[in-house]
Amino acid sequence: MSFEEAKAKLEAAGQTHVLQFWDELSAEERGTFLEEISQLQPDELVEHCREAAASASRHSSADGRLDARMQPVPPEFIGSVRKSDRETLQKWENEGLLQISQDRVAVLLLAGGQGTRLGVSYPKGMYNVGLPSGKTLYQIQAERIQKVQELANVRHGCRCTVPWYIMTSEFTLGPTEKFFKDNKYFGLCPSNVVMFEQRMIPAVGFDGKIILEKKNKIAMAPDGNGGLYRSLVDNKILADMERRNVEFLHVYCVDNILVKMADPVFIGFCVTNGADCGAKVVEKAYPAEPVGVVCRVDGVYQVIEYSEIQPETAELRGSGGELVFSAGNICNHFFTRSFLRDVAEKFESKLKQHVAIKKVPFVDGEGNLVKPTKPNGIKMEKFVFDVFQFSKKFVAFEVLREEEFSPLKNADGAPLDTPTTARRSLLAQHYRWILAAGGSFLDEQNKPFTPKHSTAQIEDPPAVCEISPLVSYFGEGLEMLLNQKNLKSPFILDENEAKNLVHTV
């Protein structure tokens, strides 16, 4: 792109100030700047800047009018681990493993965010929460994929593949690619790990003007996890899924240490019910818990953010004392490939733009970098769950929080969602698995611990124990290894230890 072409494009969008420092730039700086500007589409840019300014003013005057239009998800559209018998859960698991065995299931990771709130500059998936093994979130997830493939292979006598699609951003793609290469893709075939980058869009001032973060660089931000749908087309991911005959997709966020990759029970539940779109939910812990609620508004399924619900609505209870709006969203979804194609081709442009008012560093009229002390800019983003409204058959699946949801969002010192709470959640789960398998722990005097099945994030489990996902996906196969075994803390059950235990049975 030439300077004249860039100028014409920006004039058409009413953003000529972007080139105000052109005469001060080196040839190299001009080249990279023109490359960035070439990615912008004038029509989209005009609409984006106009909508950002308008949305910011609406955002400041938002009210709770949604409350009167909200309805909970009808019981017939909610499956539940807690309320289902073992036979039903087994039926769903069998169906899920069948679909996996036929190479019809893939997983897609939303990994565009950095670990800023954790106090690190690298992608969250590279974070080590302090497990005895030292494993990162990426490694845990990769090993769960390997194990669920193995479970399907053994059940159906085949050799299947669960492709792993990873949506990154400008900030996370490079480090993530290097991390996977350096770690030999954690045992997965590199051709089955497909990374792609979501779109970046300009940050805009309250006056509707694009913000410059440098003299030759526009302040850009990822377009939210709802940018997935456009990225699936832009990066030919839907075409890749079709080539692989993938029909069902499990989509999740990177920061949940308990996530079950391609969960056969969830996949089986959705497929059995003929769903084109599904969401895992957990029962809200308390009315004001800061999680979105899956519900219906004017008869259409969607997620309402906790900040949009008035306290009196959040506190509504049913005849049994349960919260009426209890289905907490955990960013853990099921989609059919055909539904994703419909969204990408027909509905993506209709997705709601959510406003985030942020402090955006910028260069002033003199070219000096300014780090604002109060919010000065607007970042627009779309959310992955805003497609529920387009579903022809939506279902929700309630899972147990202690088994499936422990997000990593904040640095230690915060009350919730920290490396410590994530670590405790996983270790407590593994402690419960060992007790359920008939194992027990000895203290330093070789006396048995008193079993304690109920463990919480506020304390460490009575014994430190970690089970590799390569040994057990959701607690299966442990009884033959651990029944009537006396173990000492810390105990790490990896593949080598499992082989040793088999030889002592």
From Swiss-Prot:
<dbReference type="InterPro" id="IPR002618">
    <property type="entry name" value="UDPGP_fam"/>
</dbReference>
<dbReference type="Pfam" id="PF01704">
    <property type="entry name" value="UDPGP"/>
</dbReference>
<dbReference type="GO" id="GO:0003977">
    <property type="term" value="F:UDP-N-acetylglucosamine diphosphorylase activity"/>
</dbReference>
<feature type="binding site">
    <location>
        <position position="225"/>
    </location>
    <ligand>
        <name>substrate</name>
    </ligand>
</feature>
<dbReference type="InterPro" id="IPR039741">
    <property type="entry name" value="UDP-sugar_pyrophosphorylase"/>
</dbReference>
<feature type="binding site">
    <location>
        <position position="255"/>
    </location>
    <ligand>
        <name>UTP</name>
    </ligand>
</feature>
<feature type="binding site">
    <location>
        <position position="379"/>
    </location>
    <ligand>
        <name>UTP</name>
    </ligand>
</feature>
<feature type="binding site">
    <location>
        <position position="198"/>
    </location>
    <ligand>
        <name>UTP</name>
    </ligand>
</feature>
<keyword id="KW-0808">Transferase</keyword>
<dbReference type="GO" id="GO:0006048">
    <property type="term" value="P:UDP-N-acetylglucosamine biosynthetic process"/>
</dbReference>
<feature type="binding site">
    <location>
        <position position="409"/>
    </location>
    <ligand>
        <name>substrate</name>
    </ligand>
</feature>
<feature type="binding site">
    <location>
        <position position="124"/>
    </location>
    <ligand>
        <name>UTP</name>
    </ligand>
</feature>
<keyword id="KW-0548">Nucleotidyltransferase</keyword>
<protein>
    <recommendedName>
        <fullName>UDP-N-acetylhexosamine pyrophosphorylase-like protein 1</fullName>
        <ecNumber>2.7.7.-</ecNumber>
    </recommendedName>
</protein>
<comment type="similarity">
    <text>Belongs to the UDPGP type 1 family.</text>
</comment>
<feature type="short sequence motif" description="Substrate binding">
    <location>
        <begin position="305"/>
        <end position="306"/>
    </location>
</feature>
<dbReference type="InterPro" id="IPR029044">
    <property type="entry name" value="Nucleotide-diphossugar_trans"/>
</dbReference>
<feature type="short sequence motif" description="Substrate binding">
    <location>
        <begin position="110"/>
        <end position="113"/>
    </location>
</feature>
<feature type="binding site">
    <location>
        <position position="224"/>
    </location>
    <ligand>
        <name>UTP</name>
    </ligand>
</feature>
<feature type="binding site">
    <location>
        <begin position="110"/>
        <end position="113"/>
    </location>
    <ligand>
        <name>UTP</name>
    </ligand>
</feature>
